[in-house]
Amino acid sequence: MAVIGGGPAGASAAREAAQRGLSVLLFDHAHPRRKACGGGLPVKGIEWMDAPESSIECEMTSISFTFKSTKLKIPVNKGKMVRRDDWDFYLYNRAKEAGAGHIVERVTSLELEKGFWKINGKHTAKYVIGADGVNGFTRRRLMDRIPREHLFAAGGYYLGIKPTENEVEFILGALPGKEGYLWVFPKSDHYNIGYCFNAGTLGMKEALHKLMEERWPGEFVDRKWKLSETGETVDCKQFGSAIPSYNDS
């Protein structure tokens, strides 16, 4: 089996397959690296992945949902925050420890030959798991282009202010468009702020910058924009029985 993409989904799939006795190759061209992601994990997920305490940044104390001027805040103590680069690298190493082989290269070709998949012209696998994301090679190789109106865009920011409370926030109705939301996740020494919205919405980035300047004055680092599919346009039949697709949401 070959797993293309070594993020949480791909690394976990490779680990499980290796533990069950399968011969596994895990492809990823770069580790570790930061991503536009809040880094929040439920307790069940942390328990299943045997997360070490060193990978936990802080524990959630509350979660809130805000729509325009109305806010609902709920005390909780069952969620934890991780840094995606550290967390991804930990899971990647666990997959290797379980027996998965690792190929440090970008997948650029995938061809089906006599019932086996040929990867980059030199690696062979009976089955392939595509876990390299909506913009990854697997999806682009096996599916048609997804129309922009069926895509959501996501952007992530790191705000250099130490949180005074470990409150996870989800904010709706504060930015242009009818779809999407803004998230605010506390970390040990900064905030992770991001947003998810329909890619066709105009003026989103400018509106977000204005909101951040008003609510969180200070320095922040603009991360690159990423595209993440809504899931509504994916026809699984286009993958074929040998190519499941996974993501990290």
Question: What are the functions of these language-model segments?
Answer:
Residues A2, G6, R15-C37:
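Glycine-rich FAD pyrophosphate-binding loop
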Residues G10-A11:
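N-terminal Rossmann-fold NAD(P) dinucleotide-binding loop
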Residues S23, G101, K224-K226:
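Conserved beta-strand segments of alpha/beta enzyme cores
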Residues A30-S54:
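Conserved N-terminal glycine-rich FAD pyrophosphate-binding loop of Rossmann-like flavoproteins
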Residues G40, N135, R140-F170, W216, ...:
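Central beta-strand plus flanking loop segment that forms part of the substrate or channel wall
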Residues E47-W48, P52, I56-R141, P147-A153:
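Conserved N-terminal helical subregion
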Residues M81, S109, T201-S249:
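FAD/FMN-dependent oxidoreductases across multiple families
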Residues L172-G203:
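Active-site substrate-recognition segment that forms the wall
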